[in-house]
């Protein structure tokens, strides 16, 4: 599954909310990181030749129009277009969004149409959802796919939130030329409960406590039961500025239909993992964080990871962030492409990152990010 990254480029983040849609888990038919992403010919970062965004309203309709073109758009670079129209009212909202992508190097075009709604029938109830259709045109043939997401939310007060949702993406839905979908071929229900405690006495060292609980039951569109997931997260914010968080997760026995890359289903047993993180308040020019996690991978292997972070604020408009995450596990399960089988590895890896954020003036920002990963793995057995 593709990793989702947030966009820090001001042009693609400012006044972008008109293009927000109703999908779950950051999924969207308009994912700005696609623009200027890896080129289709060599994987290098694409250069943006021009981009324009127009936002406004006409009578009861709010609209957003977007177009971007990469260098060499006639041969290699891609062209992106999006149009969003929204009719907002006090108790309801209706919207449509269309995206179109041209990828000349692959002789591919992608058209995606979406319709979303947001209805508040009462003070504590909310209905949100979205319907999508994708139409892909390539040299090898055309395809179209359908998808939907529908949720009901219950918000009895400012401390409790509940949500139940259903999604269905067929196996030919494809919005990833300009959007982001973690996967297609999925039918899933999702249940969540959120509770916040904020009414602590003024002399309490605790400012707030939050609890998040989630459960999902997924299957693919052939009816194959995938791994159910149950997660609980607890967070505590202190008046001093420190915070602590606890995460516990259980993935219940089921099939993985992606790990073998089209070579059949893989049945996995129950897996459990959890983590604890603590961040200190800012003292002088420094803030620190530490964390530990316990993970279960593969068929029966356990592992452990550590996290250490340090943030330096040399002055108000500049901060430097350093982090290091070593991890060790003994049953890292991956698909070996050349041998067309699963392999279990004992691995040790370290992830490091250095980030600099500088805000020289209002509406100006400079961000630099360097990240590296080292892996040392030893084969244990094949399947």
Tell me the role of every PLM-derived stretch.
Residues 1-217, 248-256, 281, 292-295:
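Outer-membrane beta-barrel channel domains
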Residues 47, 132-383:
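Exposed, low-structure sequence patches enriched in small/polar residues
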């Amino acid at each position: 599954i593709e990793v989702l990254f947030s966009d820090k480029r001001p042009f693609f983040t400012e006044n972008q909310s008109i293009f927000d849609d109703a999908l779950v888990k950051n999924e969207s038919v308009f994912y700005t990181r696609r623009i200027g992403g890896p080129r289709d010919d060599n994987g290098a970062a694409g250069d943006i030749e021009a981009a324009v965004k127009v936002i406004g309203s006409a009578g009861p309709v709010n609209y957003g129009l977007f177009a971007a073109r990469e260098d060499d758009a006639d041969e290699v670079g891609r062209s992106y277009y999006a149009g969003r129209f929204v009719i907002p009212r006090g108790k309801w909202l209706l919207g449509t969004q269309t995206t179109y992508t041209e990828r000349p190097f692959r002789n591919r075009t992608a058209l995606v149409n979406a319709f979303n709604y947001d209805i508040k029938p009462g003070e504590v109830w909310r209905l949100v959802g979205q319907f999508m259709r994708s139409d892909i045109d390539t040299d090898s043939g055309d395809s179209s796919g359908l998808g939907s997401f529908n949720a009901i939310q219950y918000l009895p007060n400012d401390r409790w939130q509940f949500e139940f949702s259903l999604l269905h993406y067929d196996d030919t839905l494809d919005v990833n030329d300009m959007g982001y979908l973690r996967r297609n071929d999925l039918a899933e229900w999702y249940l969540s409960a959120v509770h916040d405690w904020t009414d602590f006495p003024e002399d309490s060292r605790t400012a707030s406590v939050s609890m998040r609980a989630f459960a999902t039951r997924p299957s693919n569109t052939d009816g194959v039961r995938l791994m159910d997931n149950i997660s609980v997260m607890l967070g505590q914010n202190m008046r001093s500025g420190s915070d602590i968080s606890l995460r516990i997760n259980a993935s219940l026995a089921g099939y993985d239909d992606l790990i073998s890359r089209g070579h059949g289903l893989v049945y996995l047993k129950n897996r459990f993992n959890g983590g604890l993180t603590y961040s200190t308040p800012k003292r002088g020019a420094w803030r620190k964080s530490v964390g530990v996690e316990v993970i279960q991978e593969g068929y029966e292997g356990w592992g452990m990871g550590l996290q250490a972070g340090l943030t330096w604020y040399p002055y108000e408009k500049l901060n430097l962030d350093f982090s290091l995450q070593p991890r060790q596990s003994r049953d890292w399960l991956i698909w070996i492409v050349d041998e067309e089988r699963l392999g279990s590895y004992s691995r040790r890896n370290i992830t490091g990152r250095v980030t600099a954020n500088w805000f020289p003036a209002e509406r100006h920002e400079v961000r630099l990010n360097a990240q590296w990963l080292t892996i040392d793995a030893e084969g244990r057995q094949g399947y």
